[in-house]
């Protein structure tokens, strides 16, 4: 289950996760501060990063399985300071990290993928040095941003087109 972390009761998810051992949990965080994450995911009724970390810990304690946080690295959020902030919030003994390669729409796909893959690999190394088990998701330049992260791009596009119906964080 991949989620951006709406503010809901996660108790039923923990219960079904205890009954079905193949259920995994991943939170799409993508930024190391709540301020940056609020700009990316502009919904008020969502968990902040500390609350996500706590919910993942509760899920881990209930299931014995490690949740993941998903992080799309770009030049402004792939610094050693970002890795430090994530390690301070998310215990590497509880959490694993998925680092997602993203491609810019204004670049030639192969060049964009190579550049973004290098960013992801560098950031992955920083997280591994903090004790995280990591994996890199690389769609190899395919445009799949609509899936995996709660269809974030489509939601952001809808909000831009309907500002009267949306309330940013």
Language-model features: locations:
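Core AdoMet radical
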Residues: 1-75, 96-98
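Auxiliary Fe-S-binding modules of radical SAM enzymes
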Residues: 54-169
